[in-house]
Amino acid sequence: MYPPAPDQSADFLKVFDEERQRIKAWRKNRGVPEDDGDGRLDLIGLAFSGGGIRSATFNLGVLQALAKLEILRYVDYLSTVSGGGYIGGWLTGMIHRLAGGMKDVEEGLDPSQVNQNNLPQKAIAHLRAYSNYLTPKVSALSADTWSLFSIWSRNTLLNLVTLVAGIAALILFGRFVGLTSMVTKWTAGFGWPLAAFGFAAVTLALTLKERLPRRFCKDSGVQQLVVLPALAGAILMTFHVHAHPIQDWVPGGMALSVLFLVLQLVAGFWGWFLHHHEQKMAAVLGGLLQLGVAAVSGFVTIWLFYAVSCGVQHYAGKPFAPWLVLTVGPPAMLAAVSLGVVLNVGLMGRDIPDSNREWLGRLGAWAMIYGTGWLLFFSVAFLGPLALKAGWSAFAAWAKATVTLAWVGATIGSLMAAKGAKTSGEQNGGTMNRVAVAGPWVFLLGFVSLIGLGVHELTLGPVKAAPPAASASASATAQLTQSGWTMTAIFDSQGGPAKVAVTPWDRYWGEMAVQIRSSLLWKNPYDQAGISISWYQGLLEVMLLAVAITLVMAWRVDINEFSLQHFYKNRLARCYLGASRKREDRHANPFTNFDQNDDFPLNHLDDPNFSGPFPIINATLNLSSGRNLAWQESKGASFIFTPVYSGYDTGRDASGTSTSRRMRVGGDADGAATPTGYYPTQLVAKTKYEPETGADAATALRFTNDGIMLGTTVAISGAAANPNQGYHTSTAVAFLMSVFDVRLGWWLGNPAGPKASSNGPIFGLGYTLAELFGTTSADSAFVNLSDGGHFENMGLYELVRRKCRYIIACDAEQDEELGFGGLSTVIRMCRTDFGAEINISLSQIARKPDNKPENFSGCHYAVGDITYADGTTGSLVYLKSSLTGNDEPADVLGYHSAVPQFPHESTADQWFDESQFESYRALGYHIADKALGDGRAPLSAAKTKQDFFGALKGCVDPPKQNS
């Protein structure tokens, strides 16, 4: 095993140099020349596309054909995505574990060999047996099937506890603040100055923005220093004007606040005038202008506050007043400040610098985001339960059932659409996309409303308890006085509401007010006169309990361990990596049928004696948010796992300039500044594993520094169902999938950051929120990884980055219309990011214009040309999972007759039967043999690689330039 370099982080140039060293050594181990003359490396890359078990099985046949044709030994790179990684992991595992390495594997894979007792043939038999790899025994009463439901429900329940407790804590906080404003004048004498200080943060930050540390100049820093204090000021001011009559605060409060605001506004622009107006008189006049503008805009802002306060005071005394104030007041106050700033900018005209106008404009955007978010959340939290209670009591039984089923149906439909292969995230992408776009919002509305209703009923519990009877009368009246208004709550002798004619509206707000007198954990809420002896202590108790539950669960319920990723990884390892071992070496647990030693650290392939191709396992670095505008469409970047280095090079700097393009022509000094995150795989993700069954119990669980496991990387590469999924990421869909733990992705220490060696965050609440709201980025300590197909599904991108001279691309993605979407995407990406032009004609593979499933292709493959930015050229051999109808084996065509969707059955079908498995394997073998063999002399007999690949023209039209 090669030791890690002293300088642990690396850019792509260093990574590529290390890979070339391994390739030379491993070529020698395979018995092929170390170079191609004059020290040149004409690299051959083999790419396996995504597509789940469909792709894995198709590419198994391709591997058998390559072994028979003696091409496999010449492959330098094996780049895999998703399902292609299943079979890629299987191949590299066998090469690593067999003493003869590639020689034994190539001989064993050749189906023409009569020896069916070698490891590769036994391994293929193992793959057939586990073609239902997720649940090998498919039955309604099978423990395998029920294990899937058991693990999913366990993880979902634990994650729901964290999420529901967190949302409940927010709702309880809102109620607590609202009730506080009803029972106390705690803002007396402090409300205006504190609020003014919060708003002054705007001008203070504007004054100091050029001197602040860089981290506070970003969006997150400005939110912390400006937007959040301004929001706090809006809340304080709202409740101040609600708790005090206007005449109490206008004289003194207004004078103090106007003075404070004016001084801050003057300070904000005085420095600019002194700098830009050199003459003393100009500076004085400029200062007077700013003072006058600040006075006018400050005066208008105060009167906007006054208008808002009049609206607030108008509803004083109403049962719903505190909740209306809490919901609408802070956003209205933020809007008043924003309008004042707009007036200030307008009156300053050309005398305010454009940079400040832009800064204030973006600040206004964040104020709108926070204000709108506040308004929507508390509207749903407070009005949602009312709508549910009132509607439920008014609806007939059939209407209740209809609404419930519609909500559940929208939720299930959204989940199916969100993870379906048809969902592309486009607005006009058909029914499935419309369901994926609208359904999650329907779920979100109902979900938060139900939590709000649960909070309401929970905190109402003590009110329903029987109060001590003050007399033998049938009812007792509790007079509750809150901040200047009185509400009468009538209870019968059993403690329930008296049967009086009240509307659901009045009853709901009455229940909200009565909560102020309840204590949930101890104390009877009523004294002998029926009056509360505890005000809002109970509400505070429950709020703190919800916060505690959220924090403890976020700490203990690991964001990685309690996703479905481990379920997925364990079954992939059992099927594909388990198949790469000798049967006598496996010691599976008799109850679970798992052997932890099926898997092994990826960096164990970084062995001087290894003889396989250099593996590249492709995943997607999800970038749903961030500063790089170039990725706002794809919302992701390529992330690779290799035995030597793992990480990413986004290919662009913060301005969107293609840094990979600067590197591609020789790696000059300009390319050294590439934003990159490559880290030695040996040090990536400290891994926890179990030794073989029967080992000493004291060492049954231990840690190793050998880095991330091969099975984990394959599972990450195939994590198709994930809240953040590159091109397909949607905020509402991300929230929905996170709630129901449809999460196959992984949070890994950012290879470009200080947590590069960490296997995941210890406290995952912030990352859970990032998953919920689709705000993942490469700027955090941990990055979110998912299916490589969420970025690029062919596995070609990284081979083109490495300028492979010859590439064999095997496309087994679901493409029933033969639209070649995956290939088209990667051609565009390679042109944009690397300046590489790929010219290939696909007309012979495409179906007739009507695209009917029964129409066959004219050919299975095409050959194209690659022109790299430095002028070097290469060849692309593209093998497409397709049918011509005239040369396939009879059993393959027979399966197509029985299953017309073949060979493009849904990726959601991960449960293959024997005939399905054999049909895809045989088709892959047939296509590769037809494209690369078909009576041609083997690659080993060719004088040069160019002679062999140059002869591969076959049945395709001459390549033509793509537009």
Name each region found by the language model.
Residues 1-10, 18, 28-29, 34-963:
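Patatin-like phospholipase A catalytic core
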Residues 24:
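Interfacial juxtamembrane loops and adjacent helix segments
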